[in-house]
Amino acid sequence: MDRHFWFGKWIGDDQLSERLDALPGLMDSVLTAPFPFDSMLEAADKLADDLAQDTAIKKLLLDKALETTARQDAEQMLEATAAMLRKEAMLQKLRSELGVSHPGIPCRRYPHRQFEAWYPVGCVVHVMPSNVFAVAALGLIEGLLVGNINIVKLSVRDSTFAALFAESLCTRDISGRLQNYMAVIRTSSADQNRMQALFAQADAISAWGGERAISAVRASAAEGTRVIAWGHKISFNYVAAECLDDAELRNKALDGAAKDVCRLDQQACSSPQTLFVEGGQAEAESFARDLAERLGHISPGIPGQLPDEAEQAEITTVLNVANAEESLGLTRVFEDKHSKRWRVILDKRPGLKPSPLFRTIFVKAIQRQNIVKTLRPMRTWLQTCGLACGLKSLAELSRAFLSAGVTRITRAGEMVDSYLGAPHDGVYALTQLARRVSIDGPPAAEGIGTITQLEGCMESAPTETPILKKKEFQARATAVKQAHLMFQSGGSSGQTVFSTFSWDDYHDQMRAAGHGLVAAGLDPARDCVMNLFFSGHMYGSFISFWSILESLRVRQVPMGMIQDQAEITDKILLTGSNVLIGLPSHLVPLLESNRTQLAGRIKKIFYGGERMTRAQYRFLTESCNVSVVRSAVYGSNDAGPMGYQCPYCKGTVHHLMTDLQTLEIVDMEEDIPVSEGEVGRLIFTSRARQYPEVTRYEIGDTGRWIGGKCACGRLDPRFELSGRTGDAFKAGGPFFNYRKFVNLLDEGLEYTGPVQVHVREEGNTILLELWLAEGHAITAEAAERVLREQYAELEISKEAALAFKFQVCLVPFERFKRVTASGKIKPVCDHRTEIA
């Protein structure tokens, strides 16, 4: 019978030894390949969906769990397992424990040149406790999150739950590679040949159990192997003196302690076994009596399991001894006389005492000054303190407990509860399953932000999903409740819309954009950057680049897009800024007007928000001697950063940010991939956006793939931007919308003739010319006045002193430019020349 799930296949016990002998070859081939991280997250999230519904896999896993666990506990554990598998939960765990959302990627330690990363240890053998199915699933997921090869070792008595769980992840993995990282075997720890073969390939052994079991693992582990021990722990309640006399605090402490004693029948390491009362014996006895009364009310309402014969025998023995010692004045027993479900034992001797569990609690008096002396001898076994106290005692008591060896302090009544990303037994599990690595590359690597730029590992796009249009995306964004961060769109839709982000997603994307800025030529260790992007009105450019520059730890001068060129020039000279970032239509007039003062000062310009024309580029490089003029980032409020330039990217050519995005280029008319070199619509899928989800989003830009390898050495694919689709276009800063011009003329002047937009260059200035047809009882002046009054972006460009002009022209109807194929009037004609 097949009993082991061995890297995607079920095998019989007679095959296991042979497979163990072949492990070294498997390790060599798997560990050198990039881990399928995104596919793992998606597979886990799909399994979470299935476990949240009445599905066949949920029924199968529940049936297997019921072989060793009571139904209520099995259902609760399965529910907790499903919650753990959520993509959002796993990313939060990574961020909490490792500080990154994607381990295994060496990133620059800005402003320095070295790279660091959390990297998998390699092969992790998980030696799991018997009959605790959820622990095996948790251990497997934690190992996968870091990118390890995982072999879960269970006892022969365990069910096939963990193996079926692993198989379920594999069947939901679209990459087909996740199976190479998972095996679940059921074998006896007494089989030394197998255990030695298994441990010989382990880079780390994560072992659960008592002292004897952990010692056996350490003795069998190869020299230098990391042994991660998850041993038995002991926990307790503590009631501070101020909770004894205040009726409200006392009631809360009693309720909390009673719940802690009953929940899970004290089977968790975080369940209390002793309750300390701060004070003398009289206070302890009074609290014990009240606790017994409170248990009589609370215990019947909390379902539990009955002890087996051996466990009941231990309880009986402890009670018999306590009853005998009562005559000596050492103890007093308060017991459930009806159902025998709980018991409180007042013990007048000091010290933390283990309980026989199943709702059995010792109560002891203690003085605050004796906390450390009493508890520290047990420091290696201490875990949780369920603390009932007022605010005035919190700091002092917390310091005492933590000094004694406690690793976790909770509110009374919540000892077995936890939160996402919480440490376990004083450590983060993921740091135990990972290693911190560093790389100091050759001088050529100083322009590289992440090593993945040299690997070019773009994930496949989910082509079975329909393409997401702008209106649908905006509906998703509007549906997001309580977004952490909101930006106003630049206006490409012609309406006020918002883009929403979680803080985690935002910072991930800004860090990636920072890597792109370094690729473009920014030197975080030496440059000083003046941020001249527009701020206010909920626009994202200034604040986003503030965050980008902060992530690079580069010197920043946060000036903003102010109109006072003299002040900007003065601050450039005072601060020694040698790099400017902002809109071309703002930067070019600044250098035109102050060329003498700024001569030789500005070495680099990184632009964004609009196109850089050939004339502007030539002016900056030839007349102003700026040595580097490149795109700061290709991005949008909707999809975030999407592309970056390197020194070999000319014009609108960008490398794709594969850490964040996947890209498809589809036909202009049909949703099919374009032929090689053809221009099509850009379709982005974000790999780093939880809400709103960005899947196959038509961003509104057109472009084409650039074949071949880039001379910079990066393998991130390249694409060239060609223009915009639909009614939106950029000119002199903000987005403008053709349809909005038409609607304003219709509503304000009842103009019904044709409208055509022409965007031109006049030296370094952008001219937006709006053509209306002659003979419609309308003047150019009236039309321009209405549009300036009603279209705020026109005034923003004027107020910001951008190199931008707007004018309305009345022209003969026959002069309007038309689409050759259809004869239709072309809405937008862009006559600008871009950078060569």
Regions found by a protein language model. Give the residues of each.
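Rossmann-like NAD(P) dinucleotide-binding subdomain of oxidoreductase/dehydrogenase enzymes
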Residues: G104-C262
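Hydrophobic alpha-helical segments that mediate membrane insertion or helix-helix packing
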Residues: M40, E142-V146, I371, S489-G490
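Conserved S/T- and glycine-rich ATP-binding loop of Class I adenylate-forming
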Residues: V124, S489-S492, V529, L580, ...
